[in-house]
């Protein structure tokens, strides 16, 4: 059984995120739209493809979307959770696919701009949709309460994958990563 680590952004570390200039979704610093509008850079995230319920057909993602970052001069992240989505660089997506990330719930190419519509990076990014109920949970949390309302201090898997998603709500904005990848990530 492989030991896993949680790889994501802790809501308790907003100060650390601010130092690294990672935009904070919870504070409205990230807006997503199908068409960039300089008068409404952060519209409500209410598109046919942005929300769906179990049992209904999941609408296809658009070919591209705009991600607008407030107060940004550049892009300072490889992945960023946004509701039931991840904004992630193509480089990061390629890396996690190499180590077992095989989920495919739909994605759009992302154009990252500031509030003036100026391009913030030439690097390719994607908006990757996550469908919680489609995730086969291959993770064991030995110290998690039966009601799954808490966070576990330990997680393990028997999966061949080294990068997994969890169907546990508390881990929805994070990746579960095999400890043996720690050094590769730091490269």
Per-region residue spans from a language model:
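Phosphate/anion-contacting hairpin/loop surfaces
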Residues: 1-187
């Amino acid at each position: 059984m492989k030991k896993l680590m949680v790889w994501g952004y802790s809501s308790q570390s907003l100060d650390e995120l601010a130092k690294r200039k990672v935009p904070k979704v919870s504070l409205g610093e990230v807006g997503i739209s199908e068409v960039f509008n300089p008068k409404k850079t952060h519209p409500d995230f209410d598109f046919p493809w942005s929300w769906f319920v179990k049992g209904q057909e999941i609408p296809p993602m658009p070919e591209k979307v705009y991600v607008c970052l407030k107060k940004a001069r550049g892009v300072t992240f490889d992945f960023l959770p946004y509701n039931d989505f991840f904004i992630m660089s193509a480089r990061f997506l390629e890396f996690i696919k190499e180590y077992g990330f095989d989920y495919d719930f739909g994605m759009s190419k992302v154009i990252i701009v500031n509030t003036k519509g100026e391009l913030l990076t030439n690097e390719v990014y994607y908006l990757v949709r996550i469908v919680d109920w489609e995730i086969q949970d291959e993770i064991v949390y030995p110290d998690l309460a039966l009601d799954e309302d808490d966070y576990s201090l330990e997680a393990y898997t028997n999966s061949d994958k080294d990068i997994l998603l969890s169907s546990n709500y508390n881990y929805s904005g994070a990746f579960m990563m095999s400890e043996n990848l720690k050094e590769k990530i730091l490269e």
